[in-house]
Curated annotation (Swiss-Prot):
Expressed strongly in neuronal cells and weakly in glial cells. Belongs to the potassium channel family. G (TC 1.A.1.2) subfamily. Kv6.3/KCNG3 sub-subfamily. This is Voltage-gated potassium channel regulatory subunit KCNG3. It is a multi-pass membrane protein. It comes from the Eukaryota. Residues 188-217, 272-281, 340-357, 378-384 are extracellular. It comes from Rattus norvegicus. Pfam families: BTB_2, Ion_trans. The transmembrane segment S4 functions as a voltage-sensor and is characterized by a series of positively charged amino acids at every third position. Channel opening and closing is effected by a conformation change that affects the position and orientation of the voltage-sensor paddle formed by S3 and S4 within the membrane. A transmembrane electric field that is positive inside would push the positively charged S4 segment outwards, thereby opening the pore, while a field that is negative inside would pull the S4 segment inwards and close the pore. InterPro entries: BTB/POZ_dom, Ion_trans_dom, K_chnl_volt-dep_Kv, K_chnl_volt-dep_Kv5/Kv9, SKP1/BTB/POZ_sf, T1-type_BTB, VG_K_chnl, Volt_channel_dom_sf. The chain crosses the membrane at residues 166-187, 218-239, 251-271, 282-302, 318-339, 385-413. Regulatory subunit of the voltage-gated potassium (Kv) channel which, when coassembled with KCNB1, modulates the kinetics parameters of the heterotetrameric channel namely the inactivation and deactivation rate. Potassium channel subunit that does not form functional channels by itself. Reduces the deactivation rate. Moderately acceleratee activation. Keywords: Cell membrane, Cytoplasm, Ion channel, Ion transport, Membrane, Potassium, Potassium channel, Potassium transport, Transmembrane, Transmembrane helix, Transport, Voltage-gated channel.
Amino acid sequence: MTFGRGGAASVVLNVGGARYSLSRELLKDFPLRRVSRLHGCRSERDVLEVCDDYDRERNEYFFDRHSEAFGFILLYVRGHGKLRFAPRMCELSFYNEMIYWGLEGAHLEYCCQRRLDDRMSDTHTFHAAEELGREQPRPTGPEAAPSRRWLERMRRTFEEPTSSLAAQILASVSVVFVIVSMVVLCASTLPDWRAAAADNRSLDDRSRYSASPGREPSGIIEAICIGWFTAECIVRFIVSKNKCEFVKRPLNIIDLLAITPYYISVLMTVFTGENSQLQRAGVTLRVLRMMRIFWVIKLARHFIGLQTLGLTLKRCYREMVMLLVFICVAMAIFSALSQLLEHGLDLETSNKDFASIPAACWWVIISMTTVGYGDMYPITVPGRILGGVCVVSGIVLLALPITFIYHSFVQCYHELKFRSARYSRSLSAEFLN
């Protein structure tokens, strides 16, 4: 190190007001990369790229960082303990101090690594919300500001049900349409409903009616609901900030998949009329139109509970996959053993319900989930003992991830509540004047 006072045997590090004296020999191989970089500095400019300020007279290097965090880090690199978070300090702030001085998250103790992972997972949702809700550059011009504010009002009205009174009314109307559509869809499958509809049509029109919407009161209600959802989707697309992001959202994809079959059936009715092509397509169209049941997922846009469930499943997908693997392994073992004990050992008095391993898999799933339909059950003593072990194993396996999923659900709920309150405050501040 050629910069600084050549005769000084030590240097002074001033970190947030706390002064530490180090010998020059220690700088070259010092465990903290930022401190060791001082050894190679040749000019004051090089020094200021490493630290925040430098006092030539005192040979003192000033770092505008957290002094308490540096004290913990310095004790760790000197071998006087294990690296843990400083008390009364945010985990992310301490982690930023570690990155600044040249340490990685792996240097933390395992318990602190878990706390850091949890905190980083907590903030991931807020970073995504801030990225999506970040304001676009304000356009210039005499009419730019009113136009932008009007589009922003419309977007908040359609995207944030709690942002204003108009948004709450619009959300309530949308929920009513979803419920009405679901009720009509379910009622249309009742035998009495279909019989009453058949009495109002001629025998020749029955097959055609199954693929042609709009001929009965249920069809009229369906057309009104489709019209509302179509208009809502179009308006939301027009006022959205990012059109590509709008198309990629799962709820919008569900809207498109639920609306499209209706228009396909209408177009086929118009262009094919009464020929056999429409009759052959009737089954396909009925399957597609049954996708309207997914409209119930639209309620997630208006109810924070469904949003919490979706976010919890997204965060806990690793635990879900792990649980699925456990169940599959247990199902393979118990189904093979039950088939052997109930059918494979004694063919004369064998249990026909366990004639194959795939057939036994159904019994294993029902037993592990403690449902117990009773449609098939073991009759031999070894088979019943195996059934008891299967039930107990299922209870244990299903209970393993419950605690983690519960805490994740509560955490996601509080996050979404906080985000909703933050959006409401930002809306009031933006449109108050």
